Every structure is written in C-alpha cells, then in structure tokens.
Amino acid sequence: MYKRQAWGYARAADRLGVDIIQQCEVQGIETGPKGEVKAVSTNRGRIETKQLGVVAAGNSSVVLAMAGVRLPLETYPLQALVSEPVKEVFPCVAMSNTVHAYISQSDKGELVIGASTDQYVSYSQAGALHITSHTLEAVCELFPMFRRLRMLRNWAGSVDVTPDRSPIIGMTPVRGLYLNCGWGTGGFKATPGSGHVFAATIANDEPHTLVAPFNLDRFTNGRLIDEAAAAAVSH
C-alpha cells in the first residue's frame, strides 16, 4: 500500500515538472554570510538553492544538524511483519492499545502486522527477534486463528518522536530552511494535509495559519501541544 501511494505521488510530481533524484544522499547544507540557505551538498553533486524543505522523518535530526540546528526529537525503530498469503479472512484494520498491536490484510492476502516502537533510541533498519516474538504473541492473543501462519519477512523503519507527540511544521532559525517532521507513526496518514500546508509555508515564506502553533519555537516558549493521551500510544 505504502509503495503504491509513494509511486503515485512521484508520478504526479513528475508530470508537474518536479525532478526526483533517487539514491541522492544529502551530505551537507551550506549557508551564506547572513545564515541563510545557500546550497546542498550531495553524493551526486552540489545543488544551489535559496529554499530547502526537509521532510526526512527519522533522519530529520541528522539533516538539520548539518545546518547547525538541534531538534527535540528521538528516533526509534518501528517494526512490521508480513505473513504468507492466505484467502481473504480479515477485511478490516484492527488495533489494540491494550496489547500494542495492529493487523490488516493486503490485497495479495498477506497479513501486515505491526506494534509499538522499540524501547531504545536507534537508527537501525533491522528487526529484533524479541520485538517480533512479543508482537506475534499479542496478535495471536487477539486472533488465535492466525497461530499456524508463517511469517515471510520483517523489517524496521525509523520514526521521529517529539516530547509532546505532535509534529513540527514551519520555519527554522536558518533563513530559507523549512521543516516538517516529528510525526511518529502518523505521518503517512497525514501526508495530503501536511503536504498542502507545508507547501504553502514554503511558497509564502511564513507559517500557514493551520500549522502556526506547531512551530519549532514551542519547545522553548513552553506552548506545547500534548497529544500523547489522544494518540494512546508512545509514538
């Protein structure tokens, strides 16, 4: 599901004239004498720009550090598992905050299973066996009929979490550098809306009214937006 939507966005952007460069790693952010964005250094060359939007999820802290900006983020591995394909038996998405697990079935028949974030800060992209075991125990407690299914693969991705569990969208102390991060595990669902207001923020060089409270300054002025209880999960 995620790959199909990502490719859909990519094709739509390509039709609008956007250049998408794959396997292009950002290695540095150059700033001018007044502290403004000047260029981006990558493993495929230097790109001059006066505006730079960073939407790097779990690696946002790494990228912003290149411009001298420290972010109030913690990055955790989040694991997912996929089972062998079976006929349609689960036409919905189930999530339990009691056992910290969720499960759905793809159109190929595979069960897609996930749980809470790992309990340690890491940029690891590999799944840990003890997390996998705990997740499967939780799913089988909810749905005993899945006990005989075999898992085909598992992996981990990085999610970025803020202290108040709300995203950061808007300006940074570096002129021309804009930030959209801190979504935890909710970023995919928020992509259409957050992309719209983030684009408006960059185009107008000022925060969109809907996301003005989600600025980076809230962590220094104390105007936090506590969403931990509303999310009911740690991420």
Residue ranges and their predicted role:
Residues 21, 53, 178-180:
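Hydrophobic/aromatic beta-strand patches that form the interior of the parallel beta-sheet core
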Residues 6, 64, 199:
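Short-chain dehydrogenase/reductase
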